[in-house]
């Protein structure tokens, strides 16, 4: 642990890493935070995290780039509400970080994760709305309950314990923080997007469905078999030899 950063696993050569970012709004002693995930396969693992309430938005992109570079140039998805847009622009245009994830606004279909291609309706990160937050929190619940996301950090567990339902949304209790939880929510939204599945070759929803089907089948009583002797070859003067061959008498009509 150093200056707000905690490393749980050092980077390995081949895995795909994803960094999700929640930028402080500058109020109520808010934290700027990001989490680095090993997204190579499910269950996903948290390999590093950063959380600091003193860092300035103008300096934050340098820390984000340094750690993301360290983890095989991790794919970065930033929440661009408020000051997040400034951080995303700095990463893309000033620091020229290549692996920024872009999101496309698709009208009624909402926001869709994409690559790094600019165009109409594209933005350098995820704009957190009621819709995306609802999808993200629902996916996060499913990932945790099905053991598809391993959480090994005390600060994250602490924030999850105070992350409550309020009206039709979820947020931290009065006086608590949810910066790290929002990084989890962003990742959970991301993990169910088609582009993410193509990027990592992991369909976690399909795996969860298969696991559920296997559990149902395991709980079912096995099918029984009834031997009524009607199709028994030995009941028709036939028999099996020691080698497993079936011998039966040959029947034929007179004159054939």
Regions found by a protein language model. Give the residues of each.
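Intrinsically disordered, low-complexity segments enriched in polar/charged small residues
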Residues: 111-113, 132, 138
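Acidic, Ser/Thr-rich peripheral helices and adjacent loops at domain boundaries
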Residues: 124-134
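A generic structural motif
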Residues: 48-52, 99-119, 123-124
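RNase H-like, metal-dependent nuclease domains and their acidic two-metal-ion catalytic environment used
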Residues: 1-104, 134, 138, 142-256
């Amino acid at each position: 642990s150093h200056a707000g950063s905690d490393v749980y696993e050092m980077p390995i050569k081949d895995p795909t890493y994803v960094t999700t970012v929640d930028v402080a709004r500058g109020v109520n002693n808010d934290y700027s935070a990001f989490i680095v995930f090993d997204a190579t396969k499910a269950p996903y693992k948290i390999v590093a995290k950063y959380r600091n309430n003193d860092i300035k938005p103008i300096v934050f992109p340098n820390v984000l780039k340094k750690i993301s570079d360290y983890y095989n140039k991790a794919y970065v998805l930033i929440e661009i509400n408020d000051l997040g847009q400034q951080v995303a622009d700095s990463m893309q245009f000033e620091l020229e970080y290549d692996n920024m994830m872009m999101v496309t606004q698709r009208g009624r279909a909402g926001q869709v994760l994409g690559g790094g291609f600019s165009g109409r309706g594209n933005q350098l990160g995820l704009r957190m709305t009621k819709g995306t937050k609802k999808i993200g929190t629902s996916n996060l619940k499913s990932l945790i309950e099905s053991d598809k996301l391993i959480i090994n950090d005390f600060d994250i567990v602490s924030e999850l314990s105070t992350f409550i339902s309020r009206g039709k949304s979820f947020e931290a209790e009065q006086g608590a923080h949810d910066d790290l939880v929002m990084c989890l929510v962003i990742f959970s939204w991301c993990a169910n997007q088609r582009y993410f599945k193509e990027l990592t070759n992991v369909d976690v929803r399909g795996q969860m469905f298969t696991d559920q089907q296997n559990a149902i089948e395991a709980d079912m009583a096995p099918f029984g078999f009834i031997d009524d002797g009607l199709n028994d070859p030995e009941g028709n003067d036939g028999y099996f030899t020691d080698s497993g061959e079936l011998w039966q008498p040959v029947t034929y009509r007179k004159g054939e």
